Amino acid sequence: RIAFDICPVNIVLNYYVNSLGLEFDNEGLIAASGTIHNELLQELNSLQFYKMNPPKSLGLEWVQSTIFPLIDQKNMDIKDVLRTFVEHIAIQIGNSTKKCKDLFITGGGVFNSFLTQRIQQYSNSEISIPENQIVHFKEALIFSFLGLLRIDNQVNCLSSVTGATMDHSSGAIFLP
């Protein structure tokens, strides 16, 4: 088993759409109205992170120190930033899932139909999207399950996913 971060998605899209006074780009309509900035797209797709082998992971710090400055130096309209970044996301997900027959997409990005269409364009996979309840509560369910494994002293952290030297049971238990 292997898992890894492919690329940042909502953290970037929402950051830029927030500057328009919106929480998110509903259905990706703003991004769809923009134009791809090819130079920025090439720079994003050439970042060293995408050349690394998994396991690998991303954090807010990397986005703030790498992605935002790269985008901000271009002084683009927000709709063009969103359009370019959606294309970047779709390319990266497509590249990372080329060998996958099925692709199960979860998270807030599933509500961005333009993003999903662009991912489908670059992916050879059959895309499945779960019910809204699963999308909204996925992380709570996963972390509850990881907590249960920890309480039972079972492995909840796989080295193939995290890059750790061995599988282990991670987390702290605090009792009242």
Label every PLM stretch briefly:
Residues I2-V86, A90, D152, T162, ...:
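Conserved ATP-utilizing enzyme core subdomain
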Residues D5-I6, T106, P130-K138, T162-G163:
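Active-site nucleophile and cofactor-binding loops and adjacent substrate-binding regions
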Residues P8-L13, F85, L115, H136-E139, ...:
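Catalytic-loop motifs flanking and including active-site residues across diverse enzymes
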Residues W62-P69, F114-N124:
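Acidic-glycine-rich active-site phosphate/pyrophosphate-binding loop
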Residues I93-K101:
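Phosphate/pyrophosphate-binding loops at sites that engage ATP/ADP/AMP, CoA/4′-phosphopantetheine
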Residues C100-I119:
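Glycine-rich phosphate-binding loops at beta-strand->alpha-helix junctions
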Residues Q120-I142:
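Conserved phosphate-binding/catalytic loops in two-lobed NTP-binding clefts
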Residues L146-C157:
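Alpha-helix capping/hinge segments and adjacent helical runs
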